[in-house]
Amino acid sequence: FKNLDLVIIDEEQRFGVLQRTRLLEKAPQANALVVSATPIPRTLALTAYGDLDVTVIDEMPPGRGRHSTTCVPEEARDNLLRNIGRMVASGAQGFYICPAVEKGEAGLMDVTTARGLVRRHLGSRRVEILTGRTPSAERCRIVDDFRLGRIGLIVATTVIEVGMDIPAATLLVVDQAERFGLSQLHQMRGRVARAGAESVSYLVVSESAGEHASDRLKVLESTFDGFEIAEKDLMFRGPGDVVGIRQHGLPDLRFARLPEDTDLMLAARDEAFGRVLGDDDSAEWQLWVETVRGLTQGEVIVV
């Protein structure tokens, strides 16, 4: 792109490091704007290192109603389904999210099995399945019927995570929620918190989920703030390689940890900017430059 001046990457959390890098390499001098309701941990870590400047919009869009999130143990699923049946019978609409499309995927709840479970409690209300494999024409028909109130519940995969704007939807159930990242779950919650009515999300947690997974999901019970969720995700997953391509896990920092040492990182960032912008060519600074180059020698540098 000879005249590319601005690259905007929306829903940034859905792209891999190398995908973003290839795009930016087409015009190295272009300005880049990355947008996300929930920054992934690596992105949050880069803000502390100075690669990204951050603008935080900490207000909800006007007209949004209250939203609550509740974690539900797997053994209470039947009671939850009865409650959902009453809600949908009263006119509520919503989504039931599963981690698998087909049966037999490592014991995961699939959309066909889930539809059978919820149908027992929804009476005459219509239930449809929506996945990435659903033909385009059928997908449009389902979404249109849902928007018109003809469908009570859509059983789906994460295909509804973005781009689904149905203001009347007020109910979300995520089965085996421990299988999803906090970013995904927060994005899915946004599908049912788009109008003035109160909305609710239920996160069904498997018996096999460990204490770590349960603690992670409880973050969503306490906040609807995307940036706070990203910071918690950073603590649970780690920021990934700040100079590499891994997007989660513990970074190879020698003397600090994120986010615990954020203040130290910001101080180092300010010092580095001061040196670079001041065109420092002192022997001390050159020694630091060579030291950093030595630490990253042989690594894939994509930042």
Annotate each PLM feature.
Residues R77-Q93, D110-V303:
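C-terminal helicase module of SF1/SF2 nucleic-acid helicases/translocases
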Residues F15-G16, P41-R42, G104, F180-G181:
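Catalytic P-loop NTPase motifs of RecA-like helicase/translocase cores
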Residues N3, P41-P61, M164, L217:
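Short regulatory helix/loop adjacent to the ATP-binding pocket of P-loop NTPases
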Residues I8, N31-A37, L46-T47, I97, ...:
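Structural recognition of the conserved hydrophobic beta-strand(s) that form the central parallel beta-sheet
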Residues L23-K26, T47, T70, M87, ...:
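Amphipathic alpha-helical segments that mediate coupling or scaffolding at interfaces
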Residues L4, E11-Q13, V101, V159-I160, ...:
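Conserved Walker B
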Residues F1-V35:
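SF2 helicase catalytic motif II
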Residues D51-R115:
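Conserved interdomain linker/interface between the two RecA-like ATPase lobes of SF2 helicase motors
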